[in-house]
Amino acid sequence: MTARRVLNPVQRVAIFGGTHGNELSGVFLVNHWLKHGEEIARPGIEVRPFITNPGAVEKCVRYVDTDLNRVFDSENLRNENNLNLSYEVKRAQYINSIFGPKGSEDAYDVILDLHNTTSHMGATLILEDSKDDFTIQMFNYIKTSMAPLACSVLLIEHPRLKYATTRSIAKHPIGVEVGPQPQGVLRADVLDKMRRIIKHALDFINYFNDGKEFLPCILEVFKVLDNVAYPRNANGDCTAIIHNNLQDQDWKELKPGDPMFLTLDGRMIAYEGDCIVYPTFINEAAYYEKNQAFTTTQKMTLCAQAIRCTEPK
């Protein structure tokens, strides 16, 4: 007999835009849905669009004091020293009070957090838990619905890299990352891909609540391995740029010996790892301040059990 998980119906969904204030697809879509909610309405489900970082949105910057998408850990969410808290930590506590508390039964069922990247990643879904059958099933549905358009899945489960994302307060946190799009700019093709992803995600939830059983599935994902830094000299100055052979090659294999960086005097720096990796977030503008040239991933397959709703509508 096929193993099956019987899960509670999804009652509350949030759609976050503006976690980074200069990633405009999510900002524009959420502001549109705040005025025209019929597009995202689904029977029996509360769907709430929400601008997470209005201070950054107003200034069209990534953040005001610190990255909102990295402060949703227990230390920041419980910090009561109001006089010294950054703007984003205060926002995190406020958001947690509305959509959380994180890790509790009162937290929202699903949060869809909308992001743009300057990297050539296309449509990307971000998974936080490799054992979350509900989200894996949703991603499989979205990928199938988006075909033939590619829709990659990035798994950010990692023993050392702790993300503490804005969406992590939900029972099922979902990142939506679409690019390439410059910061502070809107592109119609990028916005359309993001809009379609949200439609398919909400449709999946609606079908699930209606009693549709989703059979066991497998999902190809790219699991985060490490972040690769730019070469720097003793003074901390960047001494090389992304090699042209690597530029815009997100999700494609990088083999040992392949060109990785190019110095300004024309010297090629090769990838010296011991296995094939799949880079992503290549030359992401927002990560220059983090000295992060790209992220390496490994390709793997996840399996999800069949799921159905305990109390179909």
Swiss-Prot record:
Keywords: Cytoplasm, Hydrolase, Metal-binding, Nucleus, Zinc
Chain positions recorded as Zn(2+) binding sites: 20, 23, 115
Reactions catalysed, as given in the entry: an N-acyl-L-aspartate + H2O = a carboxylate + L-aspartate
SUPFAM superfamilies: Zn-dependent exopeptidases
Residues binding substrate, per UniProt: 62, 69-70, 163-167, 177, 287
Top-rank taxon: Eukaryota
SS bond list: none
Subcellular location: Cytoplasm; Nucleus
Pfam family, one: AstE_AspA_hybrid
EC number: 3.5.1.15
Cofactor note: Binds 1 zinc ion per subunit.
GO cellular-component term (any): cytoplasm
Cofactor(s) recorded in Swiss-Prot or TrEMBL: Zn(2+)
Main location group: cytoplasm
Sample GO molecular function, one term: aspartoacylase activity
Residue positions of the active site: 177
Gene3D superfamilies: 2.20.25.160, Zn peptidases (3.40.630.10)
Function: Catalyzes the deacetylation of N-acetylaspartic acid (NAA) to produce acetate and L-aspartate.
Family: Belongs to the AspA/AstE family. Aspartoacylase subfamily.
Protein name: Aspartoacylase
